[in-house]
Swiss-Prot record:
UniProt keyword annotation of Signal present: no
Source lineage: Bacteria, Pseudomonadati, Pseudomonadota, Betaproteobacteria, Burkholderiales
The EC number(s) this enzyme carries: 1.14.-.-
Keyword terms of this UniProt record: Oxidoreductase, tRNA processing
NCBIfam families according to UniProt: PRK05320.1
Leader peptide range in chain numbering: none
Protein name per UniProt: tRNA uridine(34) hydroxylase
Catalytic activity: uridine(34) in tRNA + AH2 + O2 = 5-hydroxyuridine(34) in tRNA + A + H2O
Gene giving rise to this polypeptide: trhO
Length: 284
């Protein structure tokens, strides 16, 4: 059976999440869906999977059910297909933030951050500057281990271990961004959108988010100005610029990405260890 995987997020002010939670949970269970839906005062973030019919019914439910008062009417979903159900159960969780930055929740009613689409960004990178002549700086908002799998050429990478470190590293490296056009990017858009909003709020000018993240860029223009693959948080581990799964795998023990080369190491034992964690395991 073919399973449809849905991913979506939307920054929008929500104040009835506690009432929604049991109703959304019940509807997902009725449809046989599995995955996780996060509800927070700043919006919604979801990763769910089910049959084609269930996925279509859920999309219609969020967009059109009077319960949601039109707040998700424009919600855009990313879809992918798999041969099996990637999730074990269905969870609807209430959170303080839909992506943790440990800063006061953003104010969605003030509008989303400015964005640049993939084709425009490629044009800027082709010529080395934006439409006004300012140099373009690509700012990677992902964790260091994700960046190591692949990133844009000459991107700024501050080697963060978690997204909540982002505000601190931006404060410390603000001079890198002054006088330039800054394009924040991430896998699918949620982190780079919140990062761009934060930078705007602290007074950094000429900040954009990459619309749809790296995966949308791959879909529209391929791998131009990008080297490597894109790490994804599911069973595929990484996708190449053609959006095909690669031979990278995730270590069961430490969650590190193991490249095909590293898989040749004696330290790589599927389900047990990899070159990143084997020394620590043997020392213990």
């Amino acid at each position: 059976m073919t399973i449809v995987n849905l991913a979506a997020y939307h920054f929008v002010s929500l104040d009835t999440n506690e009432q929604w939670r049991p109703l959304v949970t019940a509807r997902c269970n009725e449809l046989g869906l599995r995955g996780t839906i996060l509800l927070a005062p700043e919006g919604i973030n979801l990763f769910i999977a089910g049959t084609r019919e269930a996925a279509d019914a859920f999309i219609a439910y969020l967009r059109h059910d009077p319960l949601f008062e039109g707040k998700f009417a424009t919600l855009q979903f990313k879809e992918s297909l798999s041969d099996s159900q990637p999730f074990r159960r269905m969870l609807v969780r209430l959170k303080r933030e839909i992506i943790t930055m440990k800063k006061p929740a953003i104010k969605p009613e003030l509008g989303r951050a400015p964005f640049v689409d993939a084709q425009t960004l490629k044009t800027w990178l082709d010529r080395g500057h934006d439409d006004t002549g300012r140099p373009v700086v690509m700012l990677d908002t992902r964790n260091a281990f994700e960046v190591d799998v692949g990133t844009f050429d000459d991107a700024l990478d501050y080697r963060i271990d978690k997204f909540s470190e982002f505000p601190e590293v931006i404060d410390a490296n603000r001079a890198d961004l002054e006088g330039k056009t800054v394009v924040s990017f991430c896998t699918g858009g949620i982190r780079c959108e919140k990062a761009a909003i934060h930078m705007k709020e602290i007074g950094i000018e000429n900040v954009y988010q990459l619309e749809g993240g790296i995966l949308k860029y791959f879909e529209e223009v391929g791998g131009a100005h990008y080297h490597g693959d894109c790490f994804v948080f599911d069973y595929r581990t990484a996708l190449n610029p053609q959006l095909q799964p690669t031979e990278n795998v995730t270590c069961f023990a430490c969650r590190a990405v193991v490249t095909p080369e590293a898989q040749q190491s004696p330290s790589f034992v599927p389900g047990q260890s990899c070159p990143a964690c084997a020394p620590a395991a043997s020392a213990a």
